[in-house]
């Protein structure tokens, strides 16, 4: 048996820079109310959301990612050619192959960096951060670019009163690099596939696409023959994200608070040691309930980017992080608890030092 040589990278890893991009168009609740029977007061009371950003045709997944990444790379004080790997988390890049990460890596000017996409919903940034940390410590890349990016406006049913107001678009990115001390704690992550139906796409692509081989042959992999959802004019609706709101709320508040506490325990700190809490920006009621359940001290700054950005899934944590630092609500060196959770159901939580 031959001995395989091991490769060793940095002792530890840390976030070195962060960047964000929000589309130019700001969409107030009044626009959402044009197609649903609701009110601005109801939307704010149920979600905390006042506005969200919707991308134009030019603000593609790649374009937004490149803008956010350029800022993160500059913030880290390195050049794009030093990036050894690019990890993109998204559920709204509609081309099955190739991965959008390869286009982003090329257009940024990386030197043939490894590049791939992951799909972990609203926990995607945490998954990407964990992979990046492993690459830096293992030595497969000195610097890793992690991007969370979404165009959820493309997957929003504007006639669905339960979800029409929730989602927004944007991109957030961080550069993860070497460190002599631990600045990214152990990740507490997992999945609960028995709850997969609580957040899902309304119609699988193989049922929606009129010319798919499976549909034309009269079948699907799951044998799904349920009626296709129709819009007010009788047309088959484009697939959208749907969720069981109360079930998701209960799970997020009670189960994810436990996961957040586990991340604190794994990092060897308590809530008193925290400076910042950056949960997935799903809903301000969920955020408030988690703060209460975790009994966070008053000195802890809590990200509330959801008010003006909406739920941007994989992009929400890096976007919120970028805004807190840009506004001075948080500062470089602060200790932050981050937790993402969503469709799958999946989750990932860790403690980090802010760049």
Swiss-Prot record:
Q: What is known of its domains?
A: The last Arg residue of the ACP-binding site is essential for the weak association between ACP/AcpP and FabH.
The subunit structure is: Homodimer.
Record carries keyword Transferase: yes
Active site positions: 122, 280, 311
Q: Which residues form the signal peptide?
A: none
What Gene3D superfamilies does this protein map onto?
3.40.47.10
Family, according to the entry, reads as follows: Belongs to the thiolase-like superfamily. FabH family.
Sorted alphabetically, which keywords does the UniProt record give? Acyltransferase, Cytoplasm, Fatty acid biosynthesis, Fatty acid metabolism, Lipid biosynthesis, Lipid metabolism, Multifunctional enzyme, Transferase
Q: Which GO terms describe its biological process?
A: fatty acid biosynthetic process
Q: Does the keyword RNA-binding apply?
A: no
Annotated pathway: Lipid metabolism; fatty acid biosynthesis
Give the matching Pfam families: ACP_syn_III, ACP_syn_III_C
Q: What is its EC number?
A: 2.3.1.180
Encoding gene (name)? fabH1
Question: Where does the record place the region ACP-binding?
Answer: 281-285
Its recorded reaction(s) are: malonyl-[ACP] + acetyl-CoA + H(+) = 3-oxobutanoyl-[ACP] + CO2 + CoA
The protein here is known as Beta-ketoacyl-[acyl-carrier-protein] synthase III 1
What's the source species for this entry?
Streptomyces avermitilis (strain ATCC 31267 / DSM 46492 / JCM 5070 / NBRC 14893 / NCIMB 12804 / NRRL 8165 / MA-4680)
Q: Which GO terms describe its molecular function?
A: 3-oxoacyl-[acyl-carrier-protein] synthase activity; beta-ketoacyl-acyl-carrier-protein synthase III activity
Q: Top-level EC class, please?
A: transferase
The record's InterPro entries line, in alphabetical order, gives: ACP_syn_III_C, ACP_syn_III_N, FabH, Thiolase-like
